[in-house]
Amino acid sequence: MSQVTVADPRSADDVLEVNKTPKTLFVVVDGIPADVIERVSTPGIDAVVARGSYQRAYVGGDRGMPTESPTVSAVGYMSLLTGTWSNKHNVRANYGIEPNYDFWDIFRVAKHQARAVSTGLFSTWTDNRTILMGDGLEAAGGYKFDFVADGFEKDPAFAPAFENVERIQAVDLQVTTLAAKTILESAPDLSWVYLQHTDDIGHRDGDGPSMDLAVRWIDARVLELWAAVQARSQQFVNEDWLVIVTTDHGRTSLNGKGHGGQSDRERTIWIASNSPRMVSPADRSAAIVDIYPTIVEHMRFDMPEEVAAQLEGQSLLSM
């Protein structure tokens, strides 16, 4: 395959950063509407944004067009992971999923590099690895993750005293602890952390005090991850970390218990980052599919021309 090299547009003043080893951590906290994350106190996300920026973005493709995509979780993840909408990646629900692996996910691109790129996945939903990214499947590229923490939600021996929502919360905590430990000790070049608790509370209770509490709780998990990155950066000053925190969909306006449609609140998400280079919302709107090319640019990945041509988004990093 012919290659596309993503040029680094930074000036000579940034040469020291260019010479550092790029690292990326992206975190998906499930089902938090933009209006909620903007209203509730979130010191963890605020700490990330203090170094970079926050902006609203959208999911769901273009209304009434072939790219229109359901605003549900697996669809949001796959749109981020592949930089495409449902009409390409073929994920339209959380179950009965048959991804189109012709559209490379970001970890497949990472493993396609001439240099060794280590990868990590820390997830409360095992299907992210086994189905969405087709872990080890030849059709999906055949790659395996170097660091994995998942499967707890399927293990009956894990937190058996808890039921349903509280058990998933315990899984989120375990996933965060292991992710933070791995970041600090091993620092995979590209890592994804997925946490579910907020969506569970949204479905159960909708908008209100319990959702606000869940957001504050999951923000504390973000703070744990951010603290690990900060500690790692102080120890290894040659690493250049991009941290992105986002969500996969919004919620209905009626009571916040549902999602999946094309209302403004369901389509509106947000992107928080530690990068001061993120484009201003005044310059252009952002979408979840823009995260993929943003990571590609920061990591200085080469992509096959065919893969680059399939992307729906564009990098959010400015000159």
Predicted regions and their residues:
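Active-site-proximal N-terminal segment of extracellular/periplasmic enzymes that hydrolyze or transfer
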Residues: V4-Y54
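Structural recognition of the beta-strand scaffold that forms the well-ordered cores
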Residues: T24-V28, D35, Q55-Y58, S79-L81, ...
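Metal-dependent active-site segment of extracytoplasmic phospho-/sulfohydrolases and closely related
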Residues: L25-F26, G44-I45, W217-H259, I295
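Short, structured active-site-proximal loop/turn typified by the sulfatase FGly-forming signature C/S-X-P-X-R
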Residues: D35-V72, G83, G120
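Substrate-binding rim/cap in mid-to-C-terminal beta-strand-loop elements of soluble/periplasmic
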Residues: V75-Y77, L81-T84, H259-M303, L317
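Catalytic-site neighborhoods of secreted/periplasmic enzymes
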Residues: N87, V91-E163
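Active-site rim elements
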Residues: R92-I97, P209-D212, R277-A286, P304-E305
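Active-site His/acidic residue clusters
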Residues: G134-L137, A149-G151, T177-E224
